[in-house]
Amino acid sequence: MQNETEDAFSKDQLRPIVVRSLRRSNIRKKIADYLYEISPSGSYTSEIAYNCKTTPTNVIGAIKGMGTRYKKDESLIELEIVELLTSGKDVKIYRLTDLGKEIIDSMKR
């Protein structure tokens, strides 16, 4: 029971940080919006890049963090908005988490 309280508290603390991160990066916002549109399905890097009209390198940076441009602590995975699913032959599929769906839904209102 204590873990449920701690999880809810951490999600509430995380929410403003997530919203700030999405507002600071157009690419992160486009990726989250695209994954929201195709939810509950996921997508792979190059497909996300194609639909967001950016490069796969930018997608990887926004999702995982890369160098100074995309800080790891502000990455979509680190913020628990996106989760990584591995499928078969080294295929990485990214999908929006339930927290990510809640936040994108609230931002669209």
Language-model segments: residues:
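Short, amphipathic alpha-helical interaction segments positioned at domain boundaries
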Residues: V91-R109
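Short capping segments at the starts of secondary-structure elements
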Residues: I38-Y44, T57
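Short amphipathic alpha-helical interaction segments
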Residues: K53-S75, E80, G88-V91
